[in-house]
Design a protein with these regions (language model features):
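A short beta-loop-alpha structural element at the N-terminal edge
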Residues: 32-46, 57
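Conserved catalytic-core motifs of GNAT/GCN5-like acyltransferases
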Residues: 98-104, 150-156, 162, 167-183
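Conserved acetyl-CoA pyrophosphate-binding loop and the N-cap/start of the following alpha-helix
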Residues: 124, 128-136
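Conserved beta-strand in the GNAT
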Residues: 83, 89-98, 114, 119
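Conserved acetyl-CoA binding element of GNAT-fold acetyltransferases
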Residues: 106-122
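Active-site rim helix/loop that mediates acceptor-substrate recognition in acyltransferases
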Residues: 59-81, 95, 102
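Conserved GNAT acetyl-CoA-binding A-motif
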Residues: 141-153
Length: 188
């Protein structure tokens, strides 16, 4: 039995039609997506601590908050952080580092971005929050005329980014400093 698109949307499903016996789409949570401000640093710190815990790291670092504040002060002129708010709290984030190429004669400098630090709280995953964050970030990049957006996805996130049009990038190289080992994750 098929359910109409209108009923599916009212029920919170993110797909045009739904088979009652076999639901193949995710429940959607509408989030407010906005750019971060200094006042959001405490909540960003909580999200970052949660990400660290999920990666198996210790989140009880007493100097972390001060380092985050200093990092934000340095990075805020070239980095845009999008936040997702749902149920009265921040539940996700994603950011874009903005790069501008050096101008050359006869050509204006182009801009490109590096997408990083994408994270949604476990209780809000698979509800469309990541998609809403990504649409906001890519919408900004498109409006600003970015020539490309790069990222280094986790294995689990590859299908998510592929659905948004990302694919393998030829012509890129990576150097890992000699003191780093393969046991150190390359994700951010």
């Amino acid at each position: 039995m098929l359910v109409s698109t209108a009923i599916a949307k009212l029920a919170g499903f993110a797909c045009p039609t739904v088979m009652v016996a076999q639901v193949r789409c995710a429940l959607m949570t509408e989030a407010v997506i906005r750019q971060a401000e200094v006042a959001d640093l405490a909540a960003i710190a909580l999200l970052r601590r949660q990400w660290t815990q999920e990666q198996g790291g210790a989140s009880d670092d007493p100097g972390f908050d001060e380092r985050l504040v200093a990092w934000f002060a340095r990075e805020s002129s070239r980095r845009i952080i999008w936040l997702a708010e749902a149920d009265g709290r921040l539940v996700g984030m994603m950011n874009l580092v903005v790069f501008e190429r050096m101008p050359r004669p006869g050509r204006a400098p182009s801009r490109w971005g590096y997408l990083g630090n994408a994270f949604v709280l476990a209780a809000y995953r698979n509800e469309g929050i990541g998609d809403q964050l990504l649409r906001a970030l890519l919408g900004y990049a498109d409006e600003e005329g970015f020539v490309r957006v790069l990222l280094s996805p986790s294995e689990r996130s590859v299908p998510f980014y592929e659905r948004a049009g990302f694919g393998p990038a030829d012509g890129l190289m990576l150097r890992t400093p000699p003191q780093m080992t393969d046991s150190v994750p390359r994700s951010t």
